[in-house]
Regions:
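Active-site loop-to-helix "anion-binding N-cap" substructures in soluble metabolic enzymes
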Residues: 75, 81-100, 105-109
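Surface-exposed amphipathic alpha-helices with a cationic face
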Residues: 39, 65-70, 92, 113-119
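Short secondary-structure transition/capping segments
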Residues: 58-61, 88-90, 111-115
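Conserved anion-binding
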Residues: 11-13, 17-18, 96-128
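Alpha-helix termini
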Residues: 23, 27, 92-94, 115
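Conserved N-terminal beta1-alpha1 strand-loop-helix module at the mouth
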Residues: 1-74, 82-86, 124-126
Length: 128
């Protein structure tokens, strides 16, 4: 069996954060710095999750994905704030390999079936 290491980077306000016993967050720093570190440590995939994008109606992590896709060469997945096909197309164009649908999958389960029709999308991860 092939084993893979997938690093998850939780981001809030453009800063890498670490949850503390489900009670709070500690700021760790620049997500681009840490993703390069994990890339150099030979992870197989990096998952970027904006932990409050939907809650605050924030833009998706487009700027971070655009910067990091030029510096690391592993699979990249993104979650947080994805609401429509346009968001997914933008992420794929910037170098994202997978999308993670959270709140929108709960609000609109048909959304998953709609985006399955996108020819450029290879994998969707839905979390409930």
């Amino acid at each position: 069996m092939y084993k893979r290491i997938i690093s998850r980077l939780d981001i809030k306000n453009g800063i890498l954060v670490k949850g503390i016993s489900l009670e709070g967050l500690r700021k760790l720093g620049d997500p681009i710095f840490f993703s390069k570190k994990y890339y150099n440590d030979n992870v197989d995939e990096i998952h970027f999750q904006d932990v409050v994008a939907t809650l605050y109606g924030r833009d998706i992590l487009f700027n971070i994905i655009e910067k990091i896709s030029r510096k690391i060469f592993v699979n990249v997945s993104v979650g947080g704030g994805i609401k429509n096909e346009h968001d997914i197309d933008n992420l794929l164009r910037l170098g994202c390999d997978k999308v993670v649908i959270n709140s929108e999958a709960v609000r609109n389960p048909n959304f998953l079936f709609l985006i399955l029709e996108l020819p450029s999308l290879a994998q969707i991860i839905a979390t409930f």
